[in-house]
């Protein structure tokens, strides 16, 4: 399963001071959760600000280091991906996902996915952009 981290702050801050010295331990997990990462930042007013993703493990990604230290925000979702067996290692499968002004991520796999498709409106199914959302 993937590793997920989220935070909300009363003042804009970057991931590094919010998580503190244990951030390096979290990033080290990407040696095992090596199929990329994703981060969405948000504002309490206005919703999702931006999303950054990379297929490189966070521990090797200069982009992850930049996002963690230089993107102040009052909330973020962070995802380290360990791809489920049989699912593509593809940037489109790296969470967090965005729908409108909502960002979300999940952990785990439902197989077969077709077993729950009847629970989702057809217009939403048509908007899927990856094989994991």
Where are these regions (language model features)?
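Short helix/loop capping segments that flank catalytic or ligand/cofactor-binding pockets
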Residues: 15-16, 49-51, 86-88, 113-115
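Fold-independent oxyanion-binding glycine-rich loops
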Residues: 7-10, 79-82, 107
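Extreme N-terminus nucleophile/cap motif
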Residues: 1-59, 76
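Conserved beta-strand-loop-short alpha-helix elements that form
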Residues: 2, 102-112
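Active-site-proximal cofactor/substrate-binding loop regions of enzyme domains
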Residues: 39, 65, 69
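Regulatory sensory and allosteric helical modules in signal-transduction proteins
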Residues: 49, 71-86
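Short histidine
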Residues: 111-133
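Short acidic (Asp/Glu) patches
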Residues: 54-66, 79-100, 120-124
């Amino acid at each position: 399963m993937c590793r997920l981290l989220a935070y909300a702050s009363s003042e804009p801050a970057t991931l590094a001071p919010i998580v503190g010295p244990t951030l390096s331990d979290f990033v080290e997990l990407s040696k095992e959760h090596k199929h990329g990462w994703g981060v969405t930042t948000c504002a309490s007013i206005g919703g999702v600000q931006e999303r950054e993703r990379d297929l490189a493990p966070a521990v090797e990604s200069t982009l992850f280091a930049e996002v963690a230290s230089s993107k102040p925000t009052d909330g973020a979702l962070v995802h380290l991906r360990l791809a489920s067996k049989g699912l593509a290692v593809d940037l489109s499968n790296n969470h967090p996902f965005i729908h409108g002004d909502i960002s979300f991520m999940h952990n785990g796999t439902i197989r077969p996915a077709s077993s729950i498709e009847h629970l989702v409106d057809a217009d939403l199914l048509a908007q899927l952009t990856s094989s994991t959302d």
